């Protein structure tokens, strides 16, 4: 038996408890557009015409987001080179600094999302985070500007005389990185939802606006990556670190000004509470009722709490037989409901929809965990490819030298070229073979990306072995290799294909398999994947650096690439990738895709079931 509401908001006859519609004042809280109920009236038309939000507001948000990314990514695009050349850190230490900071940066959005959803709202969170990002950029710029805040330059005649940073210098550097992490924690989880808030999705124009906003958002993000990894990196490498850092800092200051310039145009949606508390409530309620016995099949002897769901939710989830222990959280027992209908204690009674949402999360976690190692391959290539490039011929013509930090543009170009081909050619071709609307399933797309990550590591190991042999044979005392840097292109192209399949596949998978109410968790899980991959990469680097060497031989990740065995490290990541692929295949084989019905269809279906059940009982 299920307790629920009719479409008109009244309770079903003969059921205990009533679930009334929200009052107009309550609707005003969720509806930022404050529309009145009489459609077509002059007053209503005036309100719609003068409402805030829309593309005028979004232009300020996109401008802020573009300039913020130009600032933060522009500063850090070449950071591996900055740490090794200016702060004189060994490549292992520099890689660990970047990996640990990147992991922390990808954890902070979880905190930012919780604070935004529960307490202060998205505007205030982004505003505070923008100032934190600006402080971080200013701090990092100061480390390049003042001699007291970075180690003295090396003697060109004696490279081994380079001294490392002192406690003050490394402390100021880490302080700047912490500010940047705080900024990312507020901006990343809130910028997209705040942009979506500006559109009224109850209208066709609003739905189209949201779709267009996503296109513009990701297009500007790609453009920013290309600009930062070419123009900004070139200025940092060939002109000056001070100018190369000052430009991103100035752009971030402009981003803050632009964000506040749109204050009068924004739609402000009040925080409704975090989904994390809802997850905890389901788990606690199920534990409190753990001694309840559920029948093997739904025979009508158990009453489940299933009220009308929020208007923001577009589909109703079926009660599934998987993880049935959680169903106890939705079982109604004596004292669970107030006389008015709602639960007396949300930590003892949850709705069927809330329980099914938690089940979706549990089903997705194994798939999510399989993505960490493939992302670790990306992290590894992003750090050590720069070290390889610094020892290779980067000349493009007689006068231009390619910055080592700009090589990742090859992966970006691969993504930009391949995605239209994937959408226009690959998907229609595979659709004719498989009959699937997307050509291949989302899990097949993610698995293909994992395969490309493995091949990328294998190719990277082969190229590094060739580079080391040529460098040793050349006998250059500086370790330079008479080998074009474009030999690194194959591994970068393969990694670009990995991103096109794996990362975009994960984003689509999380957003399609999570209920609408839990989309914030989908984005948080993706950031958490990068955090896990960063910490895993840092752990592997530390362990290999410590244990791969001996008394008479250098370790694999020696600061002298020719003395080390970086190719062995790449092969190690490839082997872990193969193990991860087997684990992913095992998890994907047993995964059941989310099944839901539109609200109208579900309620009509439930009404039919109720009539049928009532008639059967009357016949008895």
Curated annotation (Swiss-Prot):
GO terms for molecular function: low-affinity nitrate transmembrane transporter activity; symporter activity. Disulfide bonds: none annotated. The keyword Cytoplasm does not apply. Keywords: Cell membrane, Membrane, Nitrate assimilation, Symport, Transmembrane, Transmembrane helix, Transport, Ubl conjugation. It is found in: Cell membrane. One of its GO terms (cellular component) is plasma membrane. It is a multi-pass membrane protein. Expressed in leaves and flowers. Detected in stems and siliques. Highest expression in the distal lamina of older leaves. Restricted to the sieve element and companion cell complex of the minor vein. Induction: Circadian-regulation. Expression increase during the light phase and decrease during the dark phase. InterPro entries: MFS_trans_sf, POT_fam. Coiled coil: none annotated. Residues 1-32 are annotated as: Disordered. Gene3D superfamilies: MFS general substrate transporter like domains. Disruption phenotype: No visible phenotype when grown under normal conditions. Growth retardation when starved of nitrogen. The chain crosses the membrane at residues 70-90, 95-115, 126-146, 167-187, 213-233, 241-261, 364-384, 402-422, 443-463, 485-505, 524-544, 568-588. It holds the Pfam family PTR2. GO terms for biological process: nitrate assimilation; nitrate transmembrane transport. Residues 10-25 have a biased composition (Low complexity). The keyword Ligase does not apply. Interacts with NLA. Low-affinity proton-dependent nitrate transporter. Not involved in dipeptides transport, but has a weak glucosinolate transport activity. Involved in phloem loading and nitrate remobilization from the older leaves to other tissues. Belongs to the major facilitator superfamily. Proton-dependent oligopeptide transporter (POT/PTR) (TC 2.A.17) family. This is Protein NRT1/ PTR FAMILY 2.13. It comes from Arabidopsis thaliana (Mouse-ear cress). The lineage of its organism: Eukaryota, Viridiplantae, Streptophyta, Embryophyta, Tracheophyta.
């Amino acid at each position: 038996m299920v307790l629920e509401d009719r479409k008109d908001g009244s309770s079903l006859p003969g059921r205990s408890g009533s679930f009334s519609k929200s009052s107009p004042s309550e609707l005003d809280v969720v509806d930022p557009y404050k529309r009145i109920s009489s459609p077509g009236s002059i007053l209503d038309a005036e309100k719609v015409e003068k409402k805030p939000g829309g593309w005028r507001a979004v232009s300020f948000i996109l401008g802020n987001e573009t300039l913020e990314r130009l600032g933060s990514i522009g500063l850090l695009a070449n950071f591996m080179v900055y740490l090794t050349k200016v702060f004189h850190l060994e490549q292992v230490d520099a890689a660990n600094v970047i990996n640990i900071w990147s992991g922390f940066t990808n954890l902070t959005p979880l905190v930012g999302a919780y604070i935004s959803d529960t307490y202060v709202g998205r505007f205030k969170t982004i505003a505070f985070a923008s100032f934190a990002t600006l402080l971080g950029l200013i701090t990092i710029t100061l480390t390049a500007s003042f001699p007291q805040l970075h180690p003295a330059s090396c003697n060109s005649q004696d490279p081994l005389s380079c001294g490392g940073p002192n406690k003050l210098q490394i402390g100021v550097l880490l302080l700047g990185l912490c500010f940047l992490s705080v900024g990312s924690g507020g901006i990343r989880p809130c910028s997209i939802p705040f942009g979506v808030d500006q559109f009224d999705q109850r209208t066709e124009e609003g739905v189209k606006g949201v779709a267009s906003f996503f296109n513009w958002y990701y297009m500007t993000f790609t453009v920013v990556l290309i600009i930062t990894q070419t123009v900004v990196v070139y200025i940092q490498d060939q002109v000056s670190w001070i100018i190369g850092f000052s430009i991103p800092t100035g752009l971030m200051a402009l981003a803050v000004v632009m964000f506040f310039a749109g204050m009068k145009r924004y739609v402000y949606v009040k925080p409704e509470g975090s989904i994390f508390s809802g997850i905890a409530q389901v788990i606690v309620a199920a534990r409190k009722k753990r001694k309840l016995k559920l029948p093997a099949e739904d025979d009508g002897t158990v009453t489940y709490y299933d009220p009308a769901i929020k208007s923001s939710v577009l589909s109703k989830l079926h009660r599934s037989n998987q993880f049935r222990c959680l169903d106890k959280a939705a079982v109604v027992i004596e004292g669970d409901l107030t006389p008015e209908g709602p639960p007396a204690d949300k930590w003892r009674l949850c709705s069927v929809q809330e329980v099914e949402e938690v089940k979706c999360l549990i089903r997705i976690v194994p798939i999510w965990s399989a993505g960490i190692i493939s992302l670790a391959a990306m992290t590894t290539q992003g750090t050590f490819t720069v070290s390889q490039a610094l020892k290779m011929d980067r000349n493009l013509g007689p006068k231009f030298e390619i910055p080592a930090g700009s090589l990742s543009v090859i992966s970006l170009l691969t993504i930009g070229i391949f995605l239209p081909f994937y959408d226009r050619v690959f998907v229609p071709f595979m659709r004719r073979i498989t009959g699937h609307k997307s050509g291949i399933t989302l899990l097949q797309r993610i698995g293909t990306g994992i395969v490309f990550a493995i091949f990328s590591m294998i190719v990277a190991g082969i190229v590094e072995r060739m580079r080391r042999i040529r460098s040793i044979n050349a006998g250059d005392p500086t370790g330079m290799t008479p080998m074009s840097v474009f030999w690194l292109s194959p591994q970068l192209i393969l990694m670009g294909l990995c991103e096109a399949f794996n990362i975009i596949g994960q984003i689509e998978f999380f957003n399609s398999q999570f209920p609408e109410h839990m989309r914030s968790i989908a984005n948080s899980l993706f950031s958490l994947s990068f955090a896990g991959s960063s910490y895993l990469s840092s752990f592997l680097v530390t362990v290999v650096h410590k244990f791969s060497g001996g008394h008479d031989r250098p370790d694999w990740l020696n600061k002298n690439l020719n003395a080390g065995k970086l190719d062995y490290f790449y092969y190690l990541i490839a082997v872990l990738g193969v193990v991860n692929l087997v684990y992913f295949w095992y998890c994907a084989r047993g995964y059941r895709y989310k099944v839901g019905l539109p609200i109208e269809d579900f309620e009509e279906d439930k009404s039919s079931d109720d009539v049928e059940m009532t008639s059967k009982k009357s016949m008895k």
